[in-house]
Amino acid sequence: TSKGKNNFKNFLQFSAITNNNVSVSQKGKYGSFRTSLTHVFNKGQYPNQKLNKITYTAGGEMSYKNFKLEGSASYNKRVSSNDNGSGYSGSYIYDMVIWGGTEYDVRDYKNYWVEGKEDEQQNWYDNSWYDNPWFKANEVVDAYDTDILNVYMNSSYEITPWLKAMLRGGLDFYSKKNQWRNAKSANYAWDKNGFFGISRNSGYSINTDAMLMADKTWGKLNMNVLAGGNIYF
């Protein structure tokens, strides 16, 4: 029996997802309000694979005589310790199940540094192509930190029973920070001599509408008119 027939199974770890939420709502004579906070933690099946997701939302509506207003805001933050190891490139499944052999036991390489050459040379049977999966999980890292904000507002005023004005707008914003690094001696990463890189991307859009709507009837004659404009940035 090959001692490495269960290499992939022995590499996997216990995975779990937790989801916690708290919300508060209030309703009164002129409107209502609700706010909610959610935290999701995902511990992946691979070592050093964790995702934290926080979502906060707040929204409400109010109505007073001929005026109505509603709106909401949502903030989402996602932080991942390592997004590496999935897909085709650098996949643990391909490394250990498709391309890798079964003549070794992956558990023998859990201490992934050569003794006396820590931070310089990984402990692995292949020095030219594949990487020690424990080394790759902890020393070949693609981490990210993402922030997303969505806001919208909608207001209307009934000028007369047949004439209404409306103003609405929305904002979308995102910011993402990626961090890539690999330790020295990585065979399949960004640089075998070691690498560290950071990128930041962000963007936003604003969408605003202003409209005047008329719906008037004279006997059997009905007139429906809509006039307005839009600004998108």
PLM region spans:
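Surface-exposed loop/interface segments of Gram-negative outer-membrane beta-barrel transport/assembly proteins
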Residues: 1-2, 44-51, 55-148, 166-233
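N-terminal entry motif of extracellular EGF-like repeats
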Residues: 6-7
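Predominantly transmembrane beta-strands of Gram-negative outer membrane beta-barrel pores used
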Residues: 10-12, 19-41, 57-63, 70-72
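A conditional alpha-helix N-cap/helix-loop micro-motif detector
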Residues: 13-15, 146
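Residues on the lipid-exposed face of transmembrane beta-strands in outer-membrane beta-barrel proteins
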Residues: 16, 22-26, 56-62, 151-157, ...
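Outer-membrane beta-barrel channels and translocator barrels
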Residues: 17, 28-29, 63-67, 158-160, ...
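An active-site-proximal structural segment forming one wall of the substrate-binding cleft
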Residues: 163
